[in-house]
């Protein structure tokens, strides 16, 4: 049987277009059987993510922090690295969840995107820092739920972006992202990239070179 625990995960850090979505969520022992029946380990389609995301959203205590592109790029402009931005969002999302849980929490788990020393170094100026975190390669049940919830939030935002721009934005950061970015600059001007993409990705400079 699992312990009562909190897990944290993010979606968006590997996508040139779209926000950064960090979710922390709490999983109770009594939820284990029902959550395992959802087969959270399987490869999921967009429909699967939307269907299961809605179930988890209604069932679990969680915190979503969504950093849109304009705010993300402002942090980058100030000299913050992606890993630093993620560490701060993870810490705040976990604080939000832990403050809402009345039961004892046995452990807190996150993906090992940073060495623990570096993670805590990024948080040295924060007044409240969640400590005694397990940095895991293998995901806990709460991390699996947080992953789905972050994907669900990202998809909702992403679909709205595609609709408002009247184009399909590619996921990832390959040549298709450059082609779409070039199209958007021709349609809306260079400033559009600051609003819809991550300017610290190589794609950003490559697109600006194309449209000179």
Regions found by a protein language model. Give the residues of each.
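RNase H-like, Mg2+-dependent phosphodiesterase core
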Residues: 1-212
């Amino acid at each position: 049987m699992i312990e009562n625990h909190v897990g944290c995960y993010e979606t968006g850090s590997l996508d040139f277009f779209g926000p950064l979505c960090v979710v922390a969520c709490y999983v109770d022992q009594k939820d284990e059987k029902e959550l395992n029946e959802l087969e959270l380990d399987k490869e999921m389609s967009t429909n699967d993510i939307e269907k299961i995301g809605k179930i988890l959203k209604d069932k679990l205590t969680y915190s979503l922090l969504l950093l849109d592109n304009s705010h993300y790029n402002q942090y980058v402009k100030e000299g913050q690295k992606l890993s630093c931005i993620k560490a701060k969002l993870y810490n705040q999302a976990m604080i939000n969840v832990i403050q809402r849980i009345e039961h004892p929490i046995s452990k807190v788990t996150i993906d090992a995107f940073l060495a623990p020393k570096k993670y805590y170094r990024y948080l040295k100026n924060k007044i409240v820092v969640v400590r005694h975190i397990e940095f895991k390669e293998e995901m806990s049940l709460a991390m699996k739920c947080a992953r789905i919830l972050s994907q669900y939030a990202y998809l909702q935002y992403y679909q709205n972006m595609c609709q408002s721009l009247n184009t399909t934005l590619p996921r990832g950061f390959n040549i298709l992202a450059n082609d779409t970015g070039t199209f958007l600059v021709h349609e809306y001007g260079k400033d559009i990239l600051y609003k819809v993409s991550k300017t610290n990705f190589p794609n950003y400079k490559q697109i600006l070179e194309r449209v000179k």
